[in-house]
Amino acid sequence: MEFHVRPGGALRGRLRVPGDKSISHRAIMLGALAEGETRISGFLEGADALATLRTFRAMGVDIDGPHQGRVTVQGVGLHGLRAPDGPLDLGNSGTSMRLLCGLLAGQSFDTTLTGDASLSRRPMRRVIDPLTAMGAVIESGQGGTAPLTVRGGQPLHGIDYELPVASAQVKSALLLAGLYARGRTCVTEPAPTRDHTERMLAGFGYPVRQEGRRVCIEGGGRLRGGEIDVPADISSAAFFLVGASIAEGSDITLEHVGMNPTRTGVVDILRLMGADIQVQNEREVGGEPVADLRVRSAPLKGVAIPEALVPLAIDEFPVLFVAAACAEGETLLTGAEELRVKESDRIAVMAEGLTTLGVTAEPQPDGMRIVGQPDWGGGRVHSHGDHRIAMAFTMAATRAREPIEIEDCANVNTSFPGFVELAGDAGVALTRGDAEGRAQQRSDSP
């Protein structure tokens, strides 16, 4: 599938983007391991979160839904999962694979985890090694990639682990394994990362001890089911934050956005660049801060992005590169080598696409240097099957002089089902077409 985007167009209106992907994954996982019923609203019905849902159904968990974002999970307790009939296919979801490695390490049965071609290239050694230190046995493909087989029946013991690279997925995998481990499991981060696992464990009644950048749990506790309201995903909102910032005449409000302080780096970086973002109607829902974000177009300036903000915006850099491309002056990103091992090499792929559009974008080993300009041409860019790349270049068209065609966009549904329709409602002139360029569906501004 391809996206064809006509240039220009202000973004206007009130929008609610789909539910948070990170929270949706964890709601299913913890709800399945809890005792009693868990009722979820706002669940993200994207391919990644649905892969997690199917996985727990395959392990004997009764799950009703999703029905318009509502899911009911009948928990089986920490030791109630059953062996699946065959390998568990996680599609494109790295979150599912890494977190399940920790969770499945404490089960009594063997499980094989597989994924698509992109996921099968992503590094898993970073989670396999510390889990092995806890007593887990995990077999991988050459180079520590999927498919992975997690051997059951292994006695786990707690460890005190210092993450060499900030990673919420690795931290979460170790904490989930720690539920089954003898003694205490502690993880120390070099920099703050998203803390949904810690917050949600506590919300399910499991004691969690936080000491600065060190988080600890004791094995042998219990989880209690309850209610979870999943806020809108700030990573999905980011495309509209940037689109409205760079498209002249824009004024949009994004509703019920999750504002977890470990996720708001994109707002902080855009404000450093001069973006006009107002945080309104702040409140707390289910232990997570939530707000409405009003965004109006504003002239942006290039900045040196503080490395302390990198882990807090790691998924948003593709669209932040688009913001940098139309900012006055130079933007420099360093300390973001993690971008090279996402669904694609996001540094190389974004530099390639921006260069195609006529932007000066110089990839660095751990980041990028971008020289902004008032507008740019169009052209044909390749997303390499990366959902965030495809959506980032969609927003780039709001400042282009000519149409932009984006190849290989089917994976947008992994995180943002309904993106084409919502972007059209906001004012983006976006057409979805097949590989031969034939239009299939049009979502134009009025």
Curated annotation (Swiss-Prot):
CDD domains membership: EPSP_synthase (cd01556)
Record keyword Amino-acid biosynthesis present: yes
GO terms for biological process, alphabetical: amino acid biosynthetic process; aromatic amino acid family biosynthetic process; chorismate biosynthetic process
UniProt pathway annotation: Metabolic intermediate biosynthesis; chorismate biosynthesis; chorismate from D-erythrose 4-phosphate and phosphoenolpyruvate: step 6/7
EC number(s) reported in the record: 2.5.1.19
Stored InterPro entries: Enolpyruvate_Tfrase_dom, Enolpyruvate_Tfrase_sf, EPSP_synthase, EPSP_synthase_CS, RNA3'P_cycl/enolpyr_Trfase_a/b
GO cellular component entries: cytoplasm
Binding site for phosphoenolpyruvate: K21, G94, R122, Q169, R346, R388
Subunit structure: Monomer.
Name by which UniProt lists this protein: 3-phosphoshikimate 1-carboxyvinyltransferase
